[in-house]
């Protein structure tokens, strides 16, 4: 009975020798690596979710009390975390506000930059921009960020400067480039919009202010209002351009 057992043991050793220690060790190392990566991904997802919860709580707290009065203790309570957890992600209240701007508004800036860079006719681009604004800003909590900047910016110039640098300066640069091209193609009768691209964003600001103050008295159809604004704006520009073209025709 001992001999068969001895032969089986030798056969097992031979099989291991044939496979080689590197291959069996490699399998174990591979499994360990997958488990470690999975755990790391889970930790990263949990950290990202906690960070997002803090940002959402900060938006609620800043909106309810203003930047000066809002306390990080209350932000932590809203987010369901300890106050010390906030400092794992943000240095102080100002950096939390700045990251709120960056997280909420910068992705929309990117979408608008892409729309403005298509080279399509200006009115088509503007229609796309209206849809982005209505869907991604006015229809979401992002409009609360803009309300905060309107109310808090004058009292906290550093926050206004940050918003201008991260959001407005990029939008104005993209708008001016698109408007210059449209003017060169004859789509605009003058360079007024190139000089004052803020005119394109004006109805969005009006919509946000109106919705916060007067919407319960007279609800505003934001999309229709913005289109009416652009009809008026480009209608005037088109009339100016047509007048210029007619004058040029008579001169020849």
What are the residue ranges of the model-derived segments?
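N-terminal intrinsically disordered/low-complexity leader segments
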Residues: 1-49, 60, 241-252
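Hydrophobic/aromatic-rich alpha-helical bundle segments in the mid-to-C-terminal region
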Residues: 3, 161, 183-231, 240-252
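Amphipathic, non-transmembrane alpha-helical scaffold segments
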Residues: 47, 55, 101, 160-172
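Helix-turn-helix
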Residues: 53, 57, 61-95, 99-100
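Hydrophobic alpha-helical connector segments
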Residues: 99, 113-143, 193-200, 223
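Amphipathic alpha-helical segments used for helix-helix packing
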Residues: 137-165, 208-213
């Amino acid at each position: 009975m001992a001999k068969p057992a001895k032969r089986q043991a030798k056969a097992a050793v031979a099989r291991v020798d044939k496979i080689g220690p590197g291959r069996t060790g490699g399998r174990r190392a591979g499994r360990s690596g997958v488990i470690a990566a999975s755990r790391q991904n889970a930790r990263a997802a949990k950290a990202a979710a906690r960070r997002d919860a803090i940002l959402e709580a900060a938006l609620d707290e800043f909106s309810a009390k203003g930047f000066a009065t809002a306390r990080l203790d209350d932000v932590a309570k809203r987010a369901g975390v300890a106050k010390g957890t906030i400092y794992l992600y943000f240095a102080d209240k100002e950096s939390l506000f700045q990251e709120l701007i960056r997280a909420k508004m910068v992705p929309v800036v990117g979408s608008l930059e892409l729309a403005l860079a298509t080279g399509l006719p200006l009115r088509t681009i503007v229609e796309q921009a209206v849809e982005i604004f209505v869907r991604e800003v006015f229809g979401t909590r992002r409009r609360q960020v803009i309300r905060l900047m309107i109310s808090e910016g004058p009292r906290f110039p550093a926050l206004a400067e940050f918003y201008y640098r991260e959001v407005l300066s990029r939008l104005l640069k993209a708008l001016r480039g698109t408007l210059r091209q449209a003017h060169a193609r004859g789509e605009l009768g003058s360079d007024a919009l190139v000089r004052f691209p803020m005119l394109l964003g004006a109805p969005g600001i009006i919509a946000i202010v109106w919705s916060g103050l007067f919407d319960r008295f007279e609800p505003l159809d934001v999309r229709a209002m913005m289109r009416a604004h652009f009809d008026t704006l480009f209608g005037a520009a088109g009339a100016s351009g047509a007048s210029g073209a007619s004058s040029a025709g008579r001169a020849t």
